[in-house]
Amino acid sequence: MLRFALSRIVMAIPTLLIVAVSVFVLIRLIPGDPAQLLLGDLATPASIADLRARLGLDKTWFEQFAIWFGHVLQGDLGMSITSGQSVAGLVFERFLVSAQIVLAAVLLASLVAVPAGMIAAWKQNRWPDLVLVGTATLLVSIPTFWLGLLLLLFLGLELHWLPVVGYVSIADDWKAGLLYLAMPILTLFLHEIGVLIRMARASALEVLRLDYVTHARAKGLSERTVLMNHVFRNAFGPTWTLIGLVLGNLLGGIAVVETVFTIPGLGRLLVDAIFARDYPVIQGCLLFVAAVYVLVNLVIDLFYPLFDPRVAAE
């Protein structure tokens, strides 16, 4: 297991390096000069040149990357051009906000979707299967931002059950914090539950067709025993992998939900930084998300043998 973990970590290093180079190059292809943007249209060429020199933008791309990546290896993501704050501190602070939403949504979706998918497979082509698959397909087809707006309109503006927009830290007031996070969590939950139900159903159907399941039924075992002892564990492996991918994808794509509900999370920070041409923050956000994505997949790979004995044997 240790060798497997070390091999995965070694494989992640070139991935992160490629991400770092790609992020560095792509954001510099975005039109606009950060120095000009900060100083405004009335700035003189001399003041713009001076600010570019202080920000290191007058150097070649290779020199800029070497300096930036050298600092990254020391845990220093630089300073924000617009706010002057430490990028590492800013990114981590906003990440904690986003992580609350993503983890809660994925956990709730998994707890509901996996049993629902198993039931749909067990009752294939009967009304429970048709209802669950139809609901899952509908939820997947609705764009996240539109789903968020519908919830905001219905639960917030019409029924007044939940706060419409804003954020309160759970550390300051856990009751108010949960109320403000409820709609963002519900939005992601409803969208991702459809994906997980379909995956769990497909995995369970594949396992139900295998010979050892037929043999277990022929031995007279109850359907409950067959499903729990022979189907669930073997069908959960692919779903477990998908849960990890969903977790990583949500963290990288949560900007839409955070924008709709004005949540000060990592996605909102990235969007604001892009509009402000804040290179250090953009680079820090994207590199951090990539690192978390790689870490999540590493954890998924390490725990996968628990659900597939064949992988553990290998």
Per-region residue spans from a language model:
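Short, membrane-interfacial amphipathic segments enriched in basic
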Residues: 1-2, 58, 62-63, 74-88, ...
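Short amphipathic alpha-helical coupling elements at transmembrane boundaries
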Residues: 3, 40, 50-53, 67, ...
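Membrane-water interface segments at the C-terminal ends of transmembrane alpha-helices
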Residues: 22-29, 59, 70-71, 134-165, ...
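An internal, D/E-rich "acidic patch" concept
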Residues: 58-114
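Hydrophobic alpha-helical transmembrane segments of membrane transport/permease proteins
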Residues: 15-66, 159-180
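Alpha-helical transmembrane segments of integral membrane proteins
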Residues: 2-3, 95-128, 144, 157, ...
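Hydrophobic alpha-helical transmembrane segments of multi-pass integral membrane proteins
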Residues: 17-22, 61, 103-107, 150-151, ...
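N-terminal signal-anchor/signal peptide hydrophobic helix marking the start
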Residues: 6-12
